[in-house]
Amino acid sequence: MTVLIHVLGSDIPHHNQTVLRFFNDALAATSEHARVFMVAGQDAGLRESCPALSLSFYAGKKTLAEAVIAKAKANRQQRFFFHGQFNTSLWLALLSGGIKPEQFYWHIWGADLYEVSRGLKFRLFYPVRRMAQNRVGCVFATRGDLSYFARQHPRVRGELLYFPTRMDSSLNNMANDRPREGKMTVLVGNSGDRSNEHIAALRAVYQQFGDTVNVIVPMGYPANNDAYIDEVRQAGLALFSAENLHILSEKLEFDAYLALLRQCDLGYFIFARQQGIGTLCLLIQAGVPCVLNRENPFWQDMAEQHLPVLFTTDALNEGVVREAQRQLASVDKSGITFFSPNYLEPWHNALRIAAGEAA
């Protein structure tokens, strides 16, 4: 049996690090198909922090793609598990036959599925990528993303799988002792990435609540984002008083981020695609309800787990938010499918499928 190779085909340090540490800590000991990785980007101490894994690093997406294609052609029994797929060369290789469908297994991260960029080169490439996606051996994704993907590619196999959010399961049913009265705190977005549409989200929050709430906007990631942070700050100050607007421009350590989320009463996410599952999971765990765009298919996953879902089109006020908090507090969070450790078994299943060990 040829050992499965995992591919992180784009240099996205935060997500790649999360995946590698998850495999090192939770999967590598029990499966030989969870140990070999090809990674676009620099080592940055990952070999040292993930000793159970065999890691090969490549300077860029193109270099990595060339190496993957060479391996695929040299051994047609070799299978690859692509985690997020932001690599144009790999899609083209799948479309042209350089990589065969039975060699190509893909875990959708969300941003790699949706066609939201307005840039010309992306608009031109999307139809090509769509054709390539029809040749994938099997996709793994959230319930909502599977539904979205199946409408375009009904013949491609799909299996439920969740991004391995770093979570302490002992906190699942820990009561949130934050007072549920008085001035509310609203978290806007899950990072400083433009895909969060911060300015539109701030306007939407203001339209719902006016200048009566504390607004927290975490923008410490990605790095070198000062111009956009200033743009968001200026737009925010045109709506909210300085004492109510909190733009966080420094990256927070995990425990500090967790503490920040537990101070919130509501999460507000205006983007129309599935993203930010990690932040959503941590908010739900802390008993904080979330507002989603109705076009974000992750609401299907939340509804399936009997979690309250608020939409950006709903009329929101403190009473609505407090009722959602009450409903969320009554949910047994230890049974939520996309929480740790429940997402582990689907990962074992995904490895068996991608490696050819399960039908």
UniProtKB/Swiss-Prot annotation:
<dbReference type="InterPro" id="IPR009993">
    <property type="entry name" value="WecF"/>
</dbReference>
<protein>
    <recommendedName>
        <fullName>TDP-N-acetylfucosamine:lipid II N-acetylfucosaminyltransferase</fullName>
        <ecNumber>2.4.1.325</ecNumber>
    </recommendedName>
</protein>
<keyword id="KW-0472">Membrane</keyword>
<keyword id="KW-0997">Cell inner membrane</keyword>
<dbReference type="Pfam" id="PF07429">
    <property type="entry name" value="Glyco_transf_56"/>
</dbReference>
<dbReference type="GO" id="GO:0005886">
    <property type="term" value="C:plasma membrane"/>
</dbReference>
<comment type="function">
    <text>Catalyzes the synthesis of Und-PP-GlcNAc-ManNAcA-Fuc4NAc (Lipid III), the third lipid-linked intermediate involved in ECA synthesis.</text>
</comment>
<dbReference type="GO" id="GO:0102031">
    <property type="term" value="F:4-acetamido-4,6-dideoxy-D-galactose transferase activity"/>
</dbReference>
<comment type="similarity">
    <text>Belongs to the glycosyltransferase 56 family.</text>
</comment>
<dbReference type="GO" id="GO:0036065">
    <property type="term" value="P:fucosylation"/>
</dbReference>
<keyword id="KW-0808">Transferase</keyword>
<keyword id="KW-0328">Glycosyltransferase</keyword>
<keyword id="KW-1003">Cell membrane</keyword>
<dbReference type="GO" id="GO:0008417">
    <property type="term" value="F:fucosyltransferase activity"/>
</dbReference>
<comment type="pathway">
    <text>Bacterial outer membrane biogenesis; enterobacterial common antigen biosynthesis.</text>
</comment>
<dbReference type="GO" id="GO:0009246">
    <property type="term" value="P:enterobacterial common antigen biosynthetic process"/>
</dbReference>
